[in-house]
Amino acid sequence: MAMRSHYCGLVTEALMGQTVTLAGWVNRRRDHGGVIFIDLRDREGNVQVVCDPDRADMFKTAEGVRNEFCVQVKGLVRARPEGTTNDSLKSGRIEVLCHELNVLNPSVTPPFQMDDENLSETTRLTHRVLDLRRPYMQRNLMLRYKTAIQVRNFLDKEGFIDIETPMLGKSTPEGARDYLVPSRVHDGQFFALPQSPQLYKQMLMVAGYDRYYQITKCFRDEDLRADRQPEFTQIDCETSFLNEEEIRAIFQRMVTEVFKTQLDVDLGEFPIMTYQDAAFRFGSDKPDLRVKLEFTELTEVMKDVDFKVFSGAANMQGGRVVALRVPGGARENGGLSRGEIDAYTEFVKIYGAKGLAYIKVNELAKGRDGLQSPIVKNIHDAAIAEILKRTGAQDGDLLFFGADKTKVVNDAIGALRLKIGHSEFGRKNGLFENVWAPLWVVDFPMFEYDEDDARWVAVHHPFTSPKDGHEDLMDTDPGKCLAKAYDMVLNGWELGGGSVRIHRAEVQSKVFAALKLTPEDARAKFGYLLDALQYGAPPHGGLAFGLDRLITLMTGAESIRDVIAFPKTQRAQDLLTQAPSPVDEKQLRELHIRLRNPDAAKAA
């Protein structure tokens, strides 16, 4: 007989009265009054199997099965008795009366209960094979698969061609650290694993393929966080002869269709916000628009106040002073407690802030006397009036302040905005709206100044085109040069980022010069690109989405590791296979590598 006729989770009333053959794992075995019930599980879900003692051989086998045994069942689909249906399961109105039961493979006792929702991540990743059997992980990975299929079908209909690019390439250490692969054949030389197929896809446009995509692995040797992995999956796309707006329109439509099909969610319109506006209002280039709090700009107001923390920042080159109004934060009942304010003060220090000044607005009608804060006495009446006017403060509001270098203020108060918005207080007081909030952030700076290296560096990458009319600023004022770059943001996460690329060799050389790359360095690192651009390179641009992030958002997973089958930990380790691991001396000799501290490598 066939090993299986149907998936467990797909056995429904439509199969009533039919004989089915199922294969899967014992999720649970229950003995009720001489009748054994087995919940049989596969990737599609569970089905209840009833083992009656009338069939002695089968029943004896059923008595011996335990959780996670791999078994095969042949039986009759019938309705569950009245009062025993389970509408939470597709198969919840039927059961399978077992005629034959075969143990395909027994299981040792698992190290944890499969329905335990409080497992540590270490336990889950160490026993990942078992963890992947759990419905939570199977739902996540099935959604990932269905999303990838839909993306492929969409791009195929739009004329995009799936072309693979090399995994072993040239190291160009301009951004994050590369993962390096030593060459056995070429002593002392190294390949790099791709951080992105960026230059290959641009050269495919020069080669005339017009529209390219691939769903591919990329690698970055960087410090890991909840939304980072050393290897990650990218939906990588490039297209020729389209402008920025046309490129954005294609991929907005793609994401909109994915959410509608997979989640039945209508994302609606995508507002377009400039980078400058996003940083000014929210302190972030990926604002979470679900949080209903915004910065109030106060730099000019604070230039002549006696409170040196404010006036010092306001008069500092590159300094900024802002307020964050928290409606209801100072209410006598239901406002933020002193302990919560102290906790927020410590929180902003993580982002470089030295502290967190605040004013409680108790009674506006009393003017200065209606405000509660140790800083009020050092702020003159005109500044107080302007603070209250600009923030729109009402009785019971709490005003937090950030004053420092612009980056510190944006990072610290931006993080505080999210912390308060997502808190229990924020949700109870209407500061958070539980919706999907997409937007495009556009007009990014072309360059940012790296104080450690004392030079300008590319904000996105050095192949991004400057906005029309901004090319000359690369020579005169790089900080004011804007790029044809755009990010798709959803709920505070960057889903995808891209740009119109430079397609003229002389402009590309100009960017390299602005980055303090000598012509010799530029040719050594990127000569193949500069050469390609001279052969009639078309205007082109593209975008790359992080598939892992996209699925994390769609599933509501707490960590990106919950949507990847075999992820690395935050220490870049695979706990299942114990990678990375030492290699033997012969392998190292073949690669012309000698370890400085071999004992440390063995002990790691």
From Swiss-Prot:
Tell me which UniProt keywords the record has, alphabetically.
Answer: Aminoacyl-tRNA synthetase, ATP-binding, Cytoplasm, Ligase, Nucleotide-binding, Protein biosynthesis
Question: Where on the tree of life does the source sit, at the highest rank?
Answer: Bacteria
Q: What are the residue positions of the site described as Important for tRNA non-discrimination? A: H32, G83
Q: Which SUPFAM superfamilies match?
A: Class II aaRS and biotin synthetases (SSF55681), GAD domain-like (SSF55261), Nucleic acid-binding proteins (SSF50249)
EC supergroup of this enzyme:
ligase
Give the enzyme's EC designation: 6.1.1.23
- One GO cellular component term, please give it: cytoplasm
UniProt entry tagged with the keyword Cytoplasm:
yes
An example molecular function term from Gene Ontology annotations: aspartate-tRNA(Asn) ligase activity
Q: List positions binding ATP.
A: R220, D221, E222, Q229, E494, G546, L547, D548, R549
Residue positions annotated to bind L-aspartate are E174, R220, H460, R501
Biological processes per GO annotation: aspartyl-tRNA aminoacylation
Subunit (UniProt): Homodimer.
UniProt-recorded name of the protein: Aspartate--tRNA(Asp/Asn) ligase
The organism of origin for this protein: Paracidovorax citrulli (strain AAC00-1) (Acidovorax citrulli)
